[in-house]
Amino acid sequence: IFLVKLLYGNSESQVTEDGSRNEVLNGIPDWVYEEEFAFNRALEFSPDSKMLAFIRFDEREVPSYTFPVFAGEVPHIAPYEKYPGEYTYKYPKTGEKNSKVSVHTFDIKSKVTRKINLPLEEGGYIPRIRFTQDPNKLAIMTLNRHQNRFDLYFADPRSTVCKLAVRDESDTYIRENVFDNIIFYPETFSFVSERNGYNHLYWYNINGNLIKQVTSGSYEVQDFLGYDPENGSFYYSSNEESPLRSAIYKIDRKGKKTKLSSHTGTNSALFSTDMKYFMNRYSSLDIPTVITLNDNNGKTLTTLVDNAALKQKLNGYDTVSYTHLRAHETDS
């Protein structure tokens, strides 16, 4: 890891010195983490930019896998025109050792590196680290090897002390959408869990105490989209109407639910930072992607993308249809 001072002639300073291919990775995930936990950056700056936190991956005990590399066409690799080369990387198969992971912090002013005192069991994972809005509180998310126990710790980046804030356990496994649906606010944070059989939204204070369960029912919350502190409303997407569809909703502080998307099909939303507006991306079996700008009550203000030409072209084709059958537990 290097730091570059953009305001001082792009001068560089080296943070870590033990990185080596197929041995130690600092701040970037190994193959398993990229593939299974869907992220490619394992470092975070504190909100005041005084501290850098990163995950260290020690791959030295992970078995290697090698496959041949040929010249190919695009891209063409000239050195392999006559004889193939090979590529070797760390690839743990079932039951083999994973990388040993640890969390470290770097004080940018004093240049002191510290290892966080994280109680991670043998073979455990650290799928995310993220600073809260408090620069002295680093959130560390962990999973056990079986991936059926999730722990959220808050760590002091200087003292390295960790405190368990939330633990979530499952008889089967913890879904990966937990990680990125945790959003931190000054005094609270969001959390999603299948603890009652369906994936629902929960609201915690910053110390890890449950305030309330925001959503409930026989449906799944797909994504938490944000919270508006001015009116106390929560915004999210769910498949409440049908497992085959998704829609955008909000719930106010009194628990009143309002559907914000007006089209039947697949809806996803991107909200402005003040939660006053959102872009809604919609599509269905017979309607190509339409993107609209809406206010936070669901009113469409303008259409940004309508794909009218593509829709007109598709009108000349027969679209697929589907039938929904309900199976009973006794059916085979």
What is the role of each PLM region?
Residues K5-L6, R41-E44, A53-E59, K93-K97, ...:
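Beta-strand C-termini and the immediately following turn/loop, strongest in propeller blades
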Residues T323-T330:
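Conserved small/polar residues in nucleotide/adenosyl-binding loops
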